[in-house]
Each structure stands twice: as C-alpha cells, then as structure tokens.
Amino acid sequence: MRPRVFQESCLALARLVPSFLLASCVLLLIDNFTYTVFGFGIRKTDGTIRYFYAFLYLALLGFSYRYIWIIERQKAKGRVLRLSGAALPALSVLFVIFRFLSLAGGSIAQTAETAPLKNSPNIIIISTDGLNADHLPMYGYYRNTTPFLQEFSKTALLFENAFTNAGNSGSSIASMMTGKLPTATRLIYPPDILRGKDAYQHLPAILRRLGYRSIDISIRHFVDPFDLNMRNSYDRANFREIREDKLIEYMAKYFGQDTAYFIDNTLERIESRLLHAYGISSMSDAYEEAVGDGQKKYHNDDERIEELLAFIDASTAPFFAHVHLMGTHGPKFSPKQRKYSSGQAQSVNWMVDFYDDAILDFNRYMKKIVENMRGNAVLDNTIIVIHTDHGRLWKTLLRVPLIIRFPKGRYAGRFEQNAQYLDIAPTLLDYLGIEKPDWMCGQSLLSSQISPHRRIITIRMKSKVAEVIDGLWQINQAKVKPPFFHLGFVGVIICHRWYELDLTKKVLRYSEIKGHTSPCKEGDSPDPEEIERFIVDHLKINQWDVSSLKLPLDKIYIKPAR
C-alpha cells in the first residue's frame, strides 16, 4: 500500500512540471494576442490590476494539471497511453533537474581560458547613441559641446574620417564586435540574431579566453549581447549576472541554434510576465526603453555609469567593458543641464539645441569615468575607445566620431585616412599582440598599409519598417519580405565619396561626404556603374538573392549639403 501511495505522490508532483509549461505557454499566447490586437496586456498593468493575470495563471495551472491528470487516467486504454502517461512527468522532472544543473555550470562551447597576457591593459569601449562627428568641436563644430573630450582627445588617436557599418544600434555594435559585415551575419534589425559560428566568433569571446573579466552595459532587446545571441561573451550584462545554460547549448548543438534561441527566449518571456503579474519586478518595454520617458523609467545613463564604476572598482584581473549610453538618442532629448536649450520648449522632434545639451551630458559622463580611473591609478593601463553606433537620424553616410586613447597616450595624433568600425576589434588585438582571426574583415588602424581607396560597406534597414502605430511600437511585416527582408540600403564609401543602392526602388544615389578632411584626387573614385556591380557582387557572395537587381540601375547624383 505504502509504495503505491509514494508512487502516486511522486506522480502528483511530477505533473506540476508539464502543467507549469502548458499554463505558461497558454498565458504567453493570450498576452501576445491581447497586446497585438487590442493594445493591452500584462506589461500595461500595474497595481492591483496586475493580479488579475496572477489569478488567471493559477486558473490555467489548475486546468492544465487536471488535463494532464485526465490523460494519465486514460492510460489503461492502451500501452502507448500508459507509457506516455508515465513518461511525460518523468521527462519533465529530468528537464528541470538538468536545467538547474546546467545553470550551475559553464558553457559546453566555451574554449578553455588561457592565462592573461603579461601586463594586459584594460579595455573600455564606450558609445553614445546617434552622435554626429560634426557636432563635436574637435571635428570642427562651432559650439564647445565636449570641453573635456576636446582636451582628452589630445592624448588620443582621433580619426577624422570614421564611418559606421550599419544604421541601427544592434547591427552596428554586432558588426564592430564580430568584425563581420551585417550583410554576412544577416543581423540587420530585431528579431535578427547571430547564428552558427557568428554567435561565437567575436572580440568579447577572444578577450574572455585571455582572462578578461567582462561586462556589457547597454540596452535590452536592441544591443544586449544575449538578445543578439552573442554566446560566451560577457560575465555580466545589463544589470544581471550571465551564466551560459548547458541545456540551451546542447539544444543548439543537436537541434540548431534557432530552436535553442527560441526556447531560451520563450522561457525568459514567461519569466518576465510571471514576475510582473505577481508584483515581484516590473516588465520592461523595448520601445519605451529606447525613447521618451522610458529612459527615465528603466536603467538610465546615470545608472549605467554607476554600474561601470562599480565594476572597475571591483576588478582585480584585467577587465573589458562595453558601454552604450542613450542620452543622445532622439527624437526627444532630456539633458540634465540646459546650456543651449535654456528657456526653450521641446515642441518638435530633433531640436538641435537640446541635442547639443545631450552631448554636453555625455561629455560630463566621460569626465567622471576618466577622473575615477585616474584616481584608481588604472587610466594609464587602459585602452579607451569612444564612438557612436550611427549618426543622428540613423544616418550612415557621414562622419562619426572615433577616438582611441591608448595607455600613457601612446599613438596620440590625428588619423586622416578613412576608418570604419570593423577596424576597432583588429586594432585592439594588434595592440595586444594577437593575430587577427581570418573571419574579421577590418584592418588594424595601427597599420601603415591602409589604402585611402579601400571600399567601406555600410547598410541601413528599409524605411519605416519599425513604426509606432496607435501608441504601440510595431514591425511592419508587409515590408519585411524576400529577397532582402529588413535590408533596405547598401552603401559604399571610397575616399570622400559615398554611393548607396536603394534595394527597394532599385536606384543608386551618390555624392560627396560633408566635411571630409582628406579627399582623393579627381578621377581616383570609381564611376557609379562599377560600384553598382560591386554591391551586387557583394550581396551575391553573401548568398542574397539578387535576381531582382537588373543592371544597369537608375542613378541619381545628390548635390552635397553645405
């Protein structure tokens, strides 16, 4: 009798696991449906209203438990049902046990770490969103928007003509870290992620194997390394400790990364909804985190800087930090001190005076970081990279800031030849004395072999793919279709000229880069026909379907702005 009671008790407990999974998935489906169709869901609730979903979940859990119990009661009808009735709870229990054990361990894909390099310098890569070089005094701007950085840059290597490789934060940061073009990784815009080898081939993984402690302080959903599926990358990311999940890694190995990422992402979404419904923590909103009042509600730049300083203070081993600030992200700005916008109301989007005040905020943050490092005596053993993700209004065919301060001011000066963000990782590895992997496309900017005529590729997503409709941030699925999906524009920069192919309208536009300080001689730039063939060949090499691009295409010369 007792063995049977014990068996029934074990089965009763085992039923809770599949019941939890079933109830959670149903809750997720309901929430996604109501939010998409009617504009309300768990995230929109607060106070006592959120407990409606808590009670709903309990009801779903009870229904699921009874449903599984009914299935199990029917096992007498056949051997298959008998086996499935026993196997489902057993497998569920094993799933939970294995998941907890996997969280306690490391990643199966992680290469064994080596000893740190002798006298390894610390590395900080810090960016602020949507920053134009032509709004900085060291690039010729008439306002002194960055008084501290202007002096600081005199001890650094400043790149006068630097360019991003992508017009959106995620694709820009991912290409910088991987050293691969977005056209190769297919990471253009969410929900695009790194896949296959791309998920493991990047600068953070290399530094981690060299013994670096690492942290990413950016923004969830858009730049977060694990939202981008950048595996084996950081020890801590966006205010949470990161432990690679062995179960997810095994699933990626045997069932494919798309399946593993989907399951991992689904479990995280379920967790965030349940924590919100039961009042444990608030659920974030991807759109609100990036714009408007959401920057105040969620982790703001003050919190990001404090997180960085705490990480630096606690570090004993060499550290690597990537920080992405959001104060200069439009279309509206919330500067802490208003010098240029004093007395004005921010009545329209993208007001220049408010933008310049936001840049002043970034300057103050940089001063705080550098002074803290100087006080901790780590400044002269740290490489500091200052850049942005793209230009204001997500532009790519203009100069963006790039300043690299090496330990003790080594290599200080101004670099006139064209640079791209794909060059950042190879440059850092070169300084460390590490050979650049074959999969990195950029060049070390410490090399004297950079041709002024090399072709820099940059991309932008299709226009109006992401829009705010009826107060909700949505992807216009009608525009995300084959053969180019999110990809809308492919640009090429050579010397002081830019060319950009509009993949939707099948038009090639070209012009000169405003403010370029090292133009090539007349006749050194290729003609538009050569560039359109180059772009089409580049897409073809990277397995894009280019059958819709019938050459020659229409061409439009754009008169440069003055």
Model-derived regions: residue spans:
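Alpha-helical transmembrane segments of polytopic membrane proteins
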Residues: 1, 45-60
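Membrane-interface soluble catalytic domains
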Residues: 1-40, 63-70, 85-115, 205, ...
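His/Cys-centered metal/cofactor-coordination and adjacent catalytic loops
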Residues: 118-121, 132-245, 251-252
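Short beta-strand segments
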Residues: 127, 163, 216-218, 319-327, ...
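Metal-dependent active-site segment of extracytoplasmic phospho-/sulfohydrolases and closely related
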Residues: 148, 357-398, 402-403, 408-409, ...
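Formylglycine-dependent
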Residues: 221, 227-312
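Active-site His/acidic residue clusters
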Residues: 278-290, 306-357, 393-400, 405
